[in-house]
């Protein structure tokens, strides 16, 4: 009897049923939204580790092939005048494999693009300025690093300051927030690179003071240019690249256009400097034969492009700082492969290299844990907001 008693404090069966029907779409939408978010997060993590794999693979292969190139051309000898030459060729090769990325971009768009992208004239102007800026920076740090690693015995230590510049630039340009895990990651990955220096084939012998000073300044400005390029990339993804563009397409588009501009600049430098004349001599005198000379240059260019694609992908997915941390964490891995492949000066895998590898792994893991905590925090916030609604 009380079941049918009208009271403001009670809800009738009919009203309760109506409320249940009204809440069904909301519950269904919530479940679908949760599943979609879980899928997006899982795909994001997969992309993070794939891009990190690109960076490590590209770093290892490029280091091995660059050592191989220096040995086979005789540039590893201290008394060889060619030791300080070929910097424009190196910077050219570092960017020249962009057609391979352009092909992948066209293939991706033909398979997965559902509609054509339209851009306003103002958007086109911003994109043009972005790609020009990145292309100039790409060519600058490619050439400066090529000079630095062949002229300065302290190259690796100066190279380590790249993390400091990236941290400063990303805090100013990208408003990046730091926490203890990110700071720990920066320290560990910096240590990993700082103590892993070895006698590579392109490692300079003791030379005149002016050459050492010249190489040191080139290394320094190269770190500034590289750090700035990463932060400008992140700004481009945040402010310039259209939101309708897929992440994969945006990454390949940025890498292709910036590398194309850098290649043109380095090609001009190659001819203006006269270094193009040395290519024929290297081709004729390559110790393992002409075919392997061509294959080594192609492989070196592709390896650099794979690493660059991974770096740009990490900037898009996470941040410029994380991209740099992964690059530094990969250095000990590349160094160990160099020791295994060439055994320079009876070098072996000792405590320093083992410690550097461990520091690199822990530095990478520390930043990944920071990303994991940030994602969990976002999920909790979104769930709380959904409950309020």
UniProtKB/Swiss-Prot annotation:
GO molecular function, one term: purine nucleobase transmembrane transporter activity
Membrane spanning stretches: 46-66, 88-108, 127-147, 153-173, 181-201, 217-237, 251-271, 297-317, 322-342, 349-369
Source domain of life: Eukaryota
Coiled coil start-end: none
Record's keyword annotation contains Acyltransferase: no
Main location group: membrane
InterPro entries: PUP_plant
Keywords in alphabetical order: Membrane, Transmembrane, Transmembrane helix, Transport
Membrane topology: Multi-pass membrane protein
Subcellular location: Membrane
Short name of one Pfam family: PUNUT
Record bears the keyword Signal: no
GO CC list: membrane
Family per record: Belongs to the purine permeases (TC 2.A.7.14) family.
Official protein name in the record: Putative purine permease 20
Protein's gene: PUP20
